Amino acid sequence: MNPNQKIITIGSISLGLVVFNVLLHVVSIIVTVLILGKGENNGICNGTVVREYNETVRIERVTQWHNTNVVEYVPYWNGGTYMNNTEAICDVKGFAPFSNDNGIRIGSRGHVFVIREPFVSCSPIECRAFFLTQGSLLNDKHSNGTVKDRSPFRTLMSVEVGQSPNVYQARFEAVAWSATACHDGKKWMTVGVTGPDSKAVAVIHYGGVPTDVVNSWVGDILRTQESSCTCIQGDCYWVMTDGPANRQAQYRIYKANQGRIIGQTDVSFNGGHIEECSCYPNDGKVECVCRDNWTGTNRPVLVISPDLSYRVGYLCAGIPSDTPRGEDAQFTGSCTSPIGNQGYGVKGFGFRQGTDVWMGRTISRTSRSGFEILRIKNGWTQTSKEQVKRQVVVDNLNWSGYSGSFTLPVELSGKDCLVPCFWVEMIRGKPEEKTIWTSSSSIVMCGVDYEVADWSWHDGAILPFDIDKM
């Protein structure tokens, strides 16, 4: 064969292979259309898988078209039943890590919100981390000046517990610079406070829809808990403050059903100061450990009954748990009166364990750094100084901040008692560090039947960020 004949032969074979390949594709398409055309779905094959998760049914509808699969998630809530939440708090020996969001570390290169006041609350099927955003992202120019507490850009949003407060997984809850949220077993209720200092309004959402409002009645920065509210047998309770932060203010307990207020009562507490209460259900009542921003370095205690009757006083323990505070040895404790003259304060929490109390506090007496939780024998009912357990969560070389309480409902934990849990905010940036922003991450701990070793689950972000160097 001469060279020209070889070229012609190779070309003919190649052309034949191409034609054969095209014919195979045509036949494949014809056969596919004929087979799918015999079905009742006009070429679309649908399959439905239903999985039940407690009170929720999640439907996955799978649609196949040739080589493409589309999975469409169709959420469906069957209404569920109200959580009971009348059980007692479980007696625990220590607290184990539940989650750590690492929000600021991730935010150095990820789309993470600038936040403060994070907290956790649980439904029968999940726990969610709530937080107040500043309407801006970390490492962005809009993060400048976010040390400010109240602005029209602040919103309450949430993610599944353990996730960073990122743009892609966060769910909008309310416009708010102060907030609380809780689940009654059927739907989430949120309370978001927003507006001007003199005429702030709290908007109540139930199932994502605005259902009621509370207007400022004093005209001096209406505010609420910055942690989980409490639902018992379908009714949800929370505490609000209106008035000065450094002298006598006014305090109210609210009760709602399906997002609509069905009761309220004023708390008479002359000489005492209540704000930013950390509340939880226990033995059919709501127990709250709050912040005295006026004088006391001991914490106010508010116990609420379903009929809105209440008992108010101070955490009896002879060891102070607010910051700033004096030396433990010089503190006497009181069940009825504020002790100390430090003023200011920080949001904190405590859990009653019979007559004992678990109480969290910063390790530093003067600044928001370090965090520990102490068990004081008979500290709920007496001015006891007997510390029977201590666990370090954040060492004193690292920043902490607010802390608060929540519980795991029996529907979620499978126990016959309510598991006590708490979160610790770890504030970074202004005013302590050289940045243009203020934000925080958080560690979450839950009670267990075993002692847990001391460690420091601190924030660990390396500052300043790029935006701070511009």
Swiss-Prot record:
It comes from the Viruses. GO terms for biological process: carbohydrate metabolic process; viral budding from plasma membrane. Residues 32-86 are annotated as: Hypervariable stalk region. Its main location: virion. GO terms for molecular function: exo-alpha-sialidase activity; metal ion binding. Residues 11-32 are annotated as: Involved in apical transport and lipid raft association. The active site is at D149 (proton donor/acceptor), Y402 (nucleophile). Inhibited by the neuraminidase inhibitors zanamivir (Relenza) and oseltamivir (Tamiflu). These drugs interfere with the release of progeny virus from infected cells and are effective against all influenza strains. Resistance to neuraminidase inhibitors is quite rare. It holds the Pfam family Neur. Residues 89-470 are annotated as: Head of neuraminidase. Its cofactor is Ca(2+). Residues 36-470 are virion surface. GO terms for cellular component: host cell plasma membrane; membrane; virion membrane. The chain crosses the membrane at residues 15-35. Its EC number is 3.2.1.18. Residues 1-14 are intravirion. The keyword Disulfide bond applies. SUPFAM superfamilies: Sialidases (SSF50939). Substrate binds at R116, R150, E275, E276, R291, R368. Keywords: Calcium, Disulfide bond, Glycoprotein, Glycosidase, Host cell membrane, Host membrane, Hydrolase, Membrane, Metal-binding, Signal-anchor, Transmembrane, Transmembrane helix, Virion. Disulfide bonds join C90-C417, C122-C127, C182-C229, C231-C236, C277-C290, C279-C288, C316-C335, C421-C446. Intact N-terminus is essential for virion morphogenesis. Possesses two apical sorting signals, one in the ectodomain, which is likely to be a glycan, and the other in the transmembrane domain. The transmembrane domain also plays a role in lipid raft association. Belongs to the glycosyl hydrolase 34 family. Catalyzes the removal of terminal sialic acid residues from viral and cellular glycoconjugates. Cleaves off the terminal sialic acids on the glycosylated HA during virus budding to facilitate virus release. Additionally helps virus spread through the circulation by further removing sialic acids from the cell surface. These cleavages prevent self-aggregation and ensure the efficient spread of the progeny virus from cell to cell. Otherwise, infection would be limited to one round of replication. This is Neuraminidase. The gene is NA.
